[in-house]
Regions:
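Long, contiguous, compositionally biased segments that the model treats as domain-scale units
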Residues: 1-173, 182
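Anionic group-transfer/hydrolysis microenvironments
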Residues: 35, 411, 425
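Nucleic-acid nuclease catalytic cores
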Residues: 167-168, 386, 444
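The feature marks a conserved, polyanion-engaging helical scaffold used by nucleic-acid processing enzymes
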Residues: 181-392
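Short beta-strand
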Residues: 398-403
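Short beta-strand or tight-loop elements
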Residues: 406-408
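Active-site beta-strand-loop-beta-strand hairpin of nuclease catalytic cores
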Residues: 411-421
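Catalytic cores of nucleic-acid endonucleases
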Residues: 425-444
Length: 444
């Protein structure tokens, strides 16, 4: 069920407004990239970016004075905003909050994040993630959503008043809609927003997000790209002494490797040279954090490339999600499914899997596994499509729950004593055999 379907409007209305037609079955894996806000020519986006940076400077000023746990929680800790239905959640829209650990990471590195060393055009909050090991696209996106929540509320309110029937709109007091610098606290504000009713019967507001600030992959400023772009970063260094030192340090590391290979009568491997260059650059960044700023300057100088790549990522992900899910939904409706509510969760799970297999293999549902002639290679895509065959069920279908033994793909249940685990693996996955070990762990 998509936003447009739920509220009885054509999907083109949402598209023309510039928003994403979100799904109420599961999150769409798209994330806000702050660099797209910074690069935009829209005045409202420019002001939005200024407000984001203003809050980061506020955090830096407070961090300099030292903070109590209460202050750390109030200013540095953020909850996930599930109302935009974007992110990783495979079941509904509830993901993980940024939490205390991320708050302390932010607190510890806020000075690094706000110091440009007079190199870049502006501050960028995603600079903080250059110190973060692993993917940070969901974290920086969630952080940004929290800091622009008021804008997203106004953006959605305007759409709702213009295009939706009043019966779908309700007044909500949205918590932490904006930050009041006089009281130094987040403030609630009332908005008229579309809503859905949760499984627990609670009315929850819905937020639309502009497509032009979203992408599927990592934000333009990210750690992996920083390390991969070491040659481009070196070319950006306008400090002659620093550039000479960086080049000499990397050259010495390569020479040491080549001498070692020569002593051991081994040939020089080009891939090894590249790795040594990258590792040397990584070590240099610890000593000279200005290198991070030269990298950001490099990204700032390529706004067209950033926008083009983000647009391609977003468009492909949406087209894949829309077209493939609609293909599968149509097949499911045409074929029908006999719902049996008096059987065990295990049998119901097996029946739904058989039905899913039948749709894919015998009803041309396999077309939903391809996009532009290319096979979908991600298990996540297959899992999202599997969600659509569970229509009309009274069983609880949780995607990626964690019972303390790691995440299972799905747990189907009706009470504590009537549960079944479902694991997905592509046949091409080298760890296919491991799935049976995983299930035993989950069942323990």
């Amino acid at each position: 069920m998509f936003f447009s379907e739920y509220y009885g409007i054509d999907s083109s209305v949402v598209e023309h407004y510039g928003a994403v037609d979100i799904s109420f079955v599961c999150d769409i894996p798209l994330f806000i990239d702050p660099m797209l806000i910074f690069n935009s020519e829209k005045e409202e986006y420019k002001k939005l970016h200024e407000e984001i940076i203003r809050y980061f400077h506020f955090l830096y000023q407070k961090a300099c004075d030292g903070l109590s746990n209460k202050e750390l929680k109030a200013w540095f800790e953020f909850n996930e905003v599930p109302n935009n239905w974007l992110g990783y959640s495979m079941s509904g829209n509830k993901g993980a909050a940024l939490g205390k650990q991320y708050a302390r990471f932010l607190y510890k590195n806020i000075r690094f994040a706000t110091n440009t060393n007079n190199i870049t055009k502006s501050n960028h909050i995603e600079k903080i993630m250059l110190l973060y090991e692993g993917s940070g696209k969901d974290k920086i996106s969630d952080l940004t959503v929290n800091l622009i929540k008021g804008f997203l509320c106004s953006y959605t309110e305007e759409f709702a008043r213009k295009y939706l029937d009043k019966k779908y709109i309700k007044k909500f007091h949205v918590e932490k809609a904006y930050f009041n610098y006089e009281t130094e606290s987040f403030v609630s504000k009332e908005y008229e927003l579309p809503y859905i009713t949760s499984e627990k019967g609670k009315k929850e507001y819905v937020l639309l997000t502009p497509k032009d600030i979203l992408r599927e992959d990592e934000p333009a400023i990210n750690r992996k790209d920083f390390l991969d772009s070491y040659d481009d970063v070196r070319s950006m260094i306008d400090n002659d002494s620093l550039r000479a030192y960086v080049n000499n340090y990397i050259a010495k590391a390569i020479l040491e490797y080549e001498d070692n290979q020569k002593r051991n009568k081994r040939s020089v491997n080009e891939r090894s040279v590249k790795k040594i260059e990258k590792d040397a650059f990584k070590e240099l960044a610890k000593e000279y954090p200005e290198l991070y700023d030269y990298y950001i300057k490099y990204v700032e100088n390529n706004p067209e490339q950033v926008s083009k790549l983000a647009h391609e990522e977003c468009t492909e992900e949406l087209e894949k999600f829309y077209s493939n899910s609609k293909i599968l939904i149509a097949k499911v409706i045409d074929e029908g499914y006999v719902i049996q509510e008096d059987i065990e969760a295990r049998e119901e799970a097996k029946n739904r899997l058989k039905f899913f297999k039948h749709i894919i293999e015998e009803c041309d549902g396999y077309l939903a596994l391809y996009y532009n002639g290319k096979q979908i290679a991600k298990e996540k895509d297959l899992q999202r499509l599997f969600r659509f065959v569970w229509y009309g069920t009274s069983y609880k279908v949780d995607a990626e729950p964690n019972n303390g033994r790691g995440q299972a793909d799905f747990i189907v249940s009706k009470g504590m004593n009537n549960q079944n685990i479902i694991e997905f693996k592509l046949a091409s996955n080298s760890s296919l055999g491991h799935v049976f070990t995983q299930i035993k762990i989950y069942e323990a």
